């Protein structure tokens, strides 16, 4: 065979591989509002940067007539490319080939790119669109899942892992995304669950739709499994690119620093009036975040889940930073089980990848009641406490208003190796709020006062006394628990100056096999 013929054969095979399961199935994919695996990769990566690997791999199964159904690539497109010039590894399941069902060889392809990503220290992005295990392969398919899971575990905290759910993801397949750092789901065509609606109906008699069982809305608002819910695939792929811009390539590097055109010493006079005079009146801490970060650019994580706490990425002076903030606009910013888990997971991610943490505190306490106690608020609150105490990255905390009792301790307090703790003049750092403290300290005397007016006057007097003595930032500052009380409009400048000072921080935890975080 002449070389020209061999080259022609190569080109024909490449074209065959790019068609996946064939044009008819590609058309069906498009009719559902979904892109093909290669179309997704083309949008995700820098133009012309994709280097595909294992394009000619096929499955090895002969049972059930599969020996007569061979497709080049075997249902997953794998390789590497760049995003903003930085190397990433990617795999995208191809629903046009056996519904994207996982085979032994398919898992080998995925494991191969994950292994390579670990060798070079680059992020892995998985695009999931699969009907589950390839039943015809039996235990080999299950073993393939386990091989992938082990690599997810090994890569955790070493390289960033992002999962995009752009179709079905059911049964054992859900565990790979669950082991990654971030999950993105499309609102229209994606779902995740361990057991589908039919099994649910058979086993427990419950009627539930696919969307209500495991759609993007459920997982981004109720379960917290998904960190993002996007309208369509294009938005999701763009989001991955933006997310990676805040994150380092691996745990041995720092996040990319960008040129900052936002003045470091910019003053925000509106911050001097943003805290209401009434301590029980809400405000949205999101307004404070956008006022102090570079150019108001903030990428919120878990936006629609546990809204009483906000987490996400921003920049100060071009430096990537993780922000954790109580939000009084929702449930008064109180900490509950979901908010505690949300905050703890984000803090641990930032610590794993050398991203400094800025905490904005306005928290009245933990949510009381049997519902929270039965749900394990003690353990969930301990997760947030543990995450802050374990972290060794630069940590700057600004107390905006309330910081009471146990919730004060779990939100980046000085004793948990926090580096810099600022407070606004409006800060109230105490065991509890003034009204509650007066009820405890003077409850007996209050009960003895029969005249309502005299009682109210006595309570008001005691509340004022307690506030002046304890519910302020100066009592904590007197003991060195607060490094400085700052004018709100200076917050951006003071945070940046603190972060600059901490760039060379070195701190290590005691040597151990691993920690035993309260799960």
Q: What residues fall within each predicted segment?
A:
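Ligand-binding clefts of soluble mixed alpha/beta catalytic domains
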Residues: 1-519
């Amino acid at each position: 065979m002449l070389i020209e013929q061999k080259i022609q054969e190569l080109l024909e095979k490449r074209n065959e591989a790019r068609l996946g399961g064939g044009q008819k199935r590609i058309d069906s994919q498009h009719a559902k509002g979904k892109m093909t695996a290669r179309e997704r990769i083309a949008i995700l990566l820098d133009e012309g940067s994709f280097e595909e690997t294992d394009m000619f791999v096929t499955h090895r199964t002969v049972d059930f007539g599969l020996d007569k159904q061979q497709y080049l690539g075997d249902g997953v497109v794998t390789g590497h490319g760049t995003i903003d010039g930085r190397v990433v590894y990617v795999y995208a399941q191809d629903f046009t080939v056996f519904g994207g069902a996982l085979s032994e060889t398919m898992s080998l392809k995925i494991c191969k790119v994950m292994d390579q990503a670990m060798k070079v220290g680059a992020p892995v992005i998985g695009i999931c669109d699969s009907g589950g295990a390839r039943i015809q392969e039996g235990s080999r398919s299950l073993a393939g899942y386990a091989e992938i899971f082990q690599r997810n575990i090994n890569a955790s905290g070493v390289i960033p892992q992002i999962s995009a759910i752009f179709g079905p993801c059911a049964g054992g397949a859900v565990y790979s995304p669950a082991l990654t750092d971030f999950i993105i789901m499309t609102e229209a065509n994606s779902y995740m669950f361990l057991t589908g609606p039919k099994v649910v109906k058979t086993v427990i008699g419950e009627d539930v739709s696919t969307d209500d069982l495991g759609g993007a809305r459920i997982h981004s608002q109720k379960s917290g499994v998904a960190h993002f819910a996007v309208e369509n695939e294009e938005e999701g792929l763009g989001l991955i690119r933006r997310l990676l811009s805040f994150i380092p390539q691996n745990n041995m590097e720092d996040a990319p620093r960008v040129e900052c055109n936002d003045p470091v010493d910019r003053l925000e006079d509106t911050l001097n009036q943003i805290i209401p005079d009434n301590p029980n009146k809400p405000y949205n801490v999101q307004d404070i975040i956008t006022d102090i970060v570079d150019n108001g650019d903030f990428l919120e994580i878990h936006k629609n889940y546990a809204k009483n706490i906000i987490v996400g990425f921003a920049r100060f002076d071009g430096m990537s930073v993780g922000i954790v903030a109580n939000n009084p606009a929702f449930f008064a910013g109180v900490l509950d089980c979901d908010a505690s888990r949300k905050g703890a997971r984000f803090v641990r991610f930032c610590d794993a990848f050398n991203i400094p943490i800025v905490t904005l505190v306005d928290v009245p306490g933990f949510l009381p009641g049997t519902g929270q106690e039965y749900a394990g608020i003690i353990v969930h609150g301990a997760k947030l406490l543990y995450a802050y105490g374990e972290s060794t990255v630069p940590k700057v905390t600004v107390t905006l208003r309330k910081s009471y009792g146990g919730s004060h301790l779990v939100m980046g307090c000085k004793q948990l190796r926090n580096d810099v703790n600022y407070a606004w003049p409006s800060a109230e750092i105490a065991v509890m709020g003034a009204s509650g403290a007066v009820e405890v300290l003077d409850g007996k005397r209050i009960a003895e006062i029969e005249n309502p007016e005299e009682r109210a006057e006595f309570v008001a007097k005691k509340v004022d006394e307690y506030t002046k003595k304890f519910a302020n930032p100066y009592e904590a500052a007197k003991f060195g628990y607060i490094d400085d009380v700052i004018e709100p409009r200076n917050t951006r400048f003071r945070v940046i100056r603190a972060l600059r000072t901490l760039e060379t921080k070195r701190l290590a935890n005691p040597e151990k096999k691993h920690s035993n975080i309260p799960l």
